[in-house]
Amino acid sequence: MTDLKKAAQRGIELMDLTTLNDDDTDQKVIDLCHKAKSPAGNTAAICIYPRFIPIARKTLNELDCEDIKIATVTNFPHGNDDIAIAVLETRAAVAYGADEVDVVFPYRALMDGNETVGFEMVKACKEECGDDAILKVIIESGVLKDPALIRKASELAIDAGADFIKTSTGKVPVNATLEAAEIMLTVISEKNRNVGFKPAGGVRDAAQTAEFLDLAARILGDDWVTPQTFRFGASSLLNSLLHTLELVDAPKPTSGY
């Protein structure tokens, strides 16, 4: 995909516009909702901490943007192996009104050789979501590093009922990479094409957006790359893509997600 403007437009339509900072406030989330209603069209979703779901829902309704989904996070960001806590957090997120829940897989337990706890956690959290929310599972590929572990985490998450597998929390040094994406997309192609993929963190501009879109299209077909099965998790990417589309001035450098 050499047409960067086309990649930028698709990237916005596939974006989970994210703020997951310790200093988030109601006003920052309100501002995020306004940004999600971008000059190039709405993002697919916003991703915020659970306590901000009510104000986000109110704001999106006021903006006549009910089509923008609200995603949130649980077992975040450390991916602990306490299933009960992950389940309680997921239950609360759904009760708050989340459309989508991004749960962190207990990746360190997997690195220690425990495959069971991750499977059981995803299965239990999926049951909490029921028909009310979709479940995205963050495997933290940048910490797993080993291709075999990235593959195993992806397989376990899908086998346990994940609707999406997601690379990263954005809270570790290495986030989405093309190498991890290729492994995860290949597992999806082998196990269940209805499962989605979400690279998160580290995608900075239209050129990188195009690389991930091209990779997904090569493995699963261009018609697979829709908001139902592909999302970008990002905060600073939106302004960069809008700049590519010549809709805003050049964005300021950022070290954010």
Swiss-Prot record:
Keywords: Cytoplasm, Lyase, Schiff base. Pfam families: DeoC. Its main location: cytoplasm. InterPro entries: Aldolase_TIM, DeoC, DeoC/FbaB/LacD_aldolase, DeoC_typeII. GO terms for biological process: 2-deoxyribose 1-phosphate catabolic process; carbohydrate catabolic process; deoxyribonucleotide catabolic process. Signal peptide: none annotated. The active site is at D102 (proton donor/acceptor), K166 (schiff-base intermediate with acetaldehyde), K198 (proton donor/acceptor). Transmembrane segments: none annotated. It is an enzyme of class 4 (lyase). PANTHER family: DEOXYRIBOSE-PHOSPHATE ALDOLASE (PTHR10889:SF3). Belongs to the DeoC/FbaB aldolase family. DeoC type 2 subfamily. This is Deoxyribose-phosphate aldolase. It comes from Shewanella frigidimarina (strain NCIMB 400). The gene is deoC.
